[in-house]
Amino acid sequence: MLLPEAKFLLDGESELKASGGWMVGAANGLLDNYDIDLAIASVAYGIDSLIKKRGSRISYYYIPIGKGNKRVNKDYESYCKEINDDFLPDLVHIHGSEYSHGLAYVKACGSSKAVLSIQGMTSVYAQYYNYGLTLSQIIRNITLRDCIKRKTLLSEQDDFYKRGKYEIELIKTLKHVIGRTSWDYANSLAINPNIEYHFCNETLRSQFYTEKWEYSKCEKNTIFCSSAQDPIKGFHQLLKSIAIVKRVIPDIKVRVAGPDVTLSSHPSGYTKRRGYGKILIERIKKYKLENNIEFLGPLDAEEMKTQYLRANLFVCPSTIENSPNSVGEAQMLGVPCIATYTGGVMDMIPNVQCGKMVRFEEVGMMAVAIINTLNESKHFDNSVEVSVARNRHDSKQNAVCLYNIYREIIQ
């Protein structure tokens, strides 16, 4: 993933309509508060050799995606060595263990001055990838596109298991890891009991530090979800709950950020639709939710913020999460929240003032939580929720914490 400035320098575009906003916040927090020389290396499409460009405050290295970063790619090791020799870093901060380029750096340059920030953990996520779907449902909904690309929900889950092996190897090799939840702490130490765990919260994109949700300005009975891209986001399960909610609130509306995986209105939808999209179509039709679900397409930070403030409720129905930034963003703005009780999410919702939590499997409980929250939202006092979130995502505080971690590791 390229940060906005890096993308602009490479191809003239700068919108960030994907995950990774925490890295923008972390970089700006460090640069705004400390005199440091910062470089960021990312894989990029459309190039066939290593490229270096200088931004206003950051040096960027673009590594060709080549054969891809979901498998061991020996080319990455030589690129990492070249970058390391050119920039001569005091410390290398690897963001995320989901892809192979972090392991490539450690293999090429060693682990003595490297630290990993845990984002999600594919080695753990893999078992939850298709959670809530039966084998027969998955097989029955294999599409033409799945057959052509030889990529089904089962193979996607298998891909998580394979990438998880590289993640485990990386964590076993490292001496330091940065996390922020009891879940990533437990799973990091389960892999490497000798690794030193450093706690540091994440800084969000600047757009979410201003404005506050107001009941009088929201669209009543409207739910916002940040993604339905993959089964791991749990949208297939949420649809079951929405079917129950609709009996009580007929005008319930669910708006979803990200690409429309159903491709129901796409002229070539039949040939391009993934199996998961077909499953969602099947459920939407089964529960007669065609007029209750709206896919918004990819959104940048300002557009996401608009949808949070517009919604009556934010729901995170994932099968597994560590600390979803979408929950943090919603809380920062004071939006009523419901999330599944999974992974590290419970650390983000310590009390009912900050949101409600429901087990992923409890479809009826989720439906009742949605109905009750919508009915009670007129009287919702979001001051505690906002206060807790702003303390957690305080940019200055998190920059100081991260800088001190860097100094501790270097010394």
Task: Mark where each language-model region is.
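N-terminal subdomain of nucleotide-sugar transferases
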Residues: M1-I47, S56-I58, Q397-V400, R407
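Conserved donor-binding/catalytic core segment of Leloir-type glycosyltransferases
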Residues: E214-K233, L239-K246, V254-A257
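Aromatic "clamp/platform" in nucleotide-sugar-dependent glycosyltransferases that forms part
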Residues: T319
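Conserved acidic donor-binding segment of nucleotide-sugar-dependent glycosyltransferases
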Residues: N351-V352, K356-V363, N372-K378
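Short alpha-helical donor nucleotide-sugar binding micro-motif in glycosyltransferases
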Residues: N84, P298, T306-A311
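Short hydrophobic beta-strand element within catalytic cores of glycosyltransferases
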Residues: P336-A339
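Nucleotide-activated donor-binding/catalytic signature segment of Leloir-type glycosyltransferases, i.e.
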Residues: S268-P298
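A charged, aromatic-enriched C-terminal amphipathic alpha-helix characteristic of glycosyltransferases
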Residues: R71, K378-Q411
